[in-house]
Amino acid sequence: FEARRQRQMCIRDRAFAAKTLKEKISPVFAGSKEISIKNQGLTAVEKIFNKNAVGTSGATLHAGSYVRVEVNIVGSQDTTGLMTSQELEMMAATTISPIVDGAYQSGCHTASVWDSKSQRNIPRLMKFMSDFGLITARDPENKYHPMTDVIHKVLNDITIDDWAIIIGGDSHTRMSKGVAFGADSGTVALALATGEASMPIPESVKVTFKGKMKNYMDFRDVVHATQYQMLKKFNGENVFQGRIIEVHIGTLLADQAFTFTDWTAEMKAKASICISQDKTLIESLNIAKGRIQIMIDKGMDNKSQVLQGLIDRANKRIDQIISGEKPPLTPDENAKYHAEFVVDLDIIDEPMIADPDVNNEDVSKRYTHDTIREISFYQGEKHIDLGFIGSCMVHKGDIKIVARMLKNLENQYGKVQFKAPLVITAPTYNTVSYTHLTLPTSFEV
């Protein structure tokens, strides 16, 4: 980490000096690998990386190129945040890079085990990160109620640009806008201090849909069916692994799109990008504005007014879309993908269950989502120990569906009888607070 830190800081400082003095500089280190293919279009992630690239030759870059990019949103997780703060101190960094639009320090992982160690360490972490310029889940002076919301759910709410790059200290850092990557504490520290990150441009797998989702199905079933049909088509090979899933469901709003992108972490994908239509992206940005405003109303904005700045940027992005100045992100028609895959919605006619094969001879496959089954497989004989609705993929529409199901059972039988405990909880306060309801509905492609 130390060698990487020194190299990154040296490159950044020289680049800043050259930009300020408007002078060209000769390279000190060997140039990064650049792959540029003539007459080949760009995938969505290639477009984002080219737009945010720093210090390149100026050529159009394709997958496999190693690129230094500017980062828009950064998230620090509370269990690794102390290491991030130590690494920032090692850099002698005292304030967040002006390149970063917004950054958030979570408190979600330690909230569930608020033991004596957490009670000693987390307030100290929140104070450091607040002073550094981050929006913090817990206020160092206890001016607002602790925000124990799931980190990547919050990052999804504060991402306000479909061309953004997001770095987060959590494996589920997958957004419905832009492209997001989970990262270690050192990479998060570098992103906070320099506003940059370095990584190769990943290959992409294009996922499109045909047919119509049946009105009694849930979008989560489409998510599981995507994996089921993909594994079937590619003879059990997970073509998503280590790659970008570029998903084309242009009418999905932020919450449902996040259900898909968040799930891609379980399929070992590097990241995921949602391609949205104009109207859908505008509505998703308005949802983000509403949720950021809730955070402002709670008193979470800082002296730099980071949260208000995000709302201002969202308004600017909406104006760009409406005027046609900068349409929503789309890949080029002649972009090259590692694989292309079409999900058939017409054949999804019953709920799909992810059932990890914990007895698989291959240890690496015991706790993955490689085993997807239709609910009829269990013939009503599967024993349920616990029901839990409240993962990071859950949104308000899901909770409303559960409420309707329980009301229907009560109307039919006079009461609701549970054969196992059922836990229902919202992954974020914003899920409950925000008035916009995103009910899952059938969609046709």
Question: Which sequence ranges carry the predicted segments?
Answer:
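Accessory "access/gating" subregions that flank catalytic or transport cores
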Residues: 149-158, 163, 268-416, 425-434
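N-terminal amphipathic, basic-rich helices that act as targeting or association modules
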Residues: 28-98, 254-258
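Flexible inter-domain linker/hinge segments
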Residues: 15-44, 311, 317-320
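Long, structured ligand/cofactor-binding scaffold of large enzymes
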Residues: 64-198
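Short internal beta-strands
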Residues: 101-110, 275-276, 420-428
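Mobile "lid/hinge" segments at catalytic clefts and subdomain interfaces of large enzymes
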Residues: 171-283, 291-293
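Single conserved hydrophobic/aromatic residue that forms the stacking wall/gate
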Residues: 1-7, 11, 436-445
